[in-house]
């Protein structure tokens, strides 16, 4: 009798148990999907769909710590004249400009690279295990060129970007130090008239 209870042969009972299992699975899948959606939302910048500041920093730090012997490069990227865009054309155009720059970055870096928005009009991009510095210089120039077609991008004429680049030293594992170098190089690009890239430690 106990064997009959543990292995029901009545079709109605079997279907009921199967339905319960399927319902439970659907509920679990729904919960997992919601959890995954919340996780993604917590890691991604809502406007640009790039990584947010905390997630980008964490991802880059992980690579620096796990592959300290490799050559990596960090880009610090800033939209030139962004305050003027907001003041003259309004915040809607400002948001559009940020989204355009984000799309340019997303389309020019590979899936193994890390791209994040770290502030209002500030971004970082991280190229890992690079073969040569020349590849990084070429990537920076591609980005500068990509934003020049203002009409196609529907952005104001005065919008450009400035870029600062910092390469890792052997066994350099601090994201903070690397970012400070890239940010210093970005400042040099701004001082040089904007719409250009500069490398940390290299005089213009």
Question: What do these predicted regions represent?
Answer:
Residues 1-2:
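As written
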Residues 39, 52-73, 80-110, 116-120, ...:
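Conserved long alpha-helical elements within nucleotide-processing catalytic cores of c-di-GMP signaling
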Residues 126-128, 166-168:
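Short hydrophobic/aromatic beta-strand micro-patches
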Residues 22, 86, 144-151, 183-186, ...:
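Protein kinase-like catalytic domain
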Residues 8-9, 129-131:
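Hydrophobic/aromatic docking surface of two-component receiver
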Residues 9-46, 54-64, 114:
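Signal-transducing coiled-coil linker helices
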Residues 117, 133, 145-162, 190:
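Catalytic core regions of nucleotide second-messenger enzymes
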Residues 137, 168-198, 204:
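Catalytic-core segments of nucleotide cyclases and related cyclic-nucleotide turnover enzymes
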């Amino acid at each position: 009798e106990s064997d009959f209870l543990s292995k029901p042969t009545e079709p109605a009972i079997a279907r009921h148990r199967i339905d319960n299992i399927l319902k439970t699975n659907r509920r679990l899948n729904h919960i997992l999907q919601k959890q995954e959606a919340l996780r993604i939302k917590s890691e991604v910048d809502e406007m640009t769909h790039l990584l947010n500041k905390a997630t980008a920093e964490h991802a880059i730090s992980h690579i620096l710590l796990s592959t300290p012997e490799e050559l990596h490069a960090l880009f610090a990227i800033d939209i030139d004249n962004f305050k003027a865009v907001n003041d003259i054309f309004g915040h809607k155009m400002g948001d559009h400009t940020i989204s355009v720059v984000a799309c340019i970055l997303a389309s020019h870096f590979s899936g193994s690279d890390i791209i994040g928005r770290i502030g209002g009009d500030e971004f970082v991009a991280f190229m890992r295990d690079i073969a040569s510095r020349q590849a990084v210089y070429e990537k920076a120039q591609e980005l500068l060129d990509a934003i020049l077609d203002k009409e196609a991008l529907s952005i104001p004429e005065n919008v450009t970007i400035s870029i600062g680049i910092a390469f890792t030293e052997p066994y350099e594992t601090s994201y903070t130090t690397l970012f400070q170098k890239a940010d210093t190089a970005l400042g040099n690009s701004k001082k040089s008239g904007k719409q250009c890239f500069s490398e940390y430690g290299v005089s213009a």
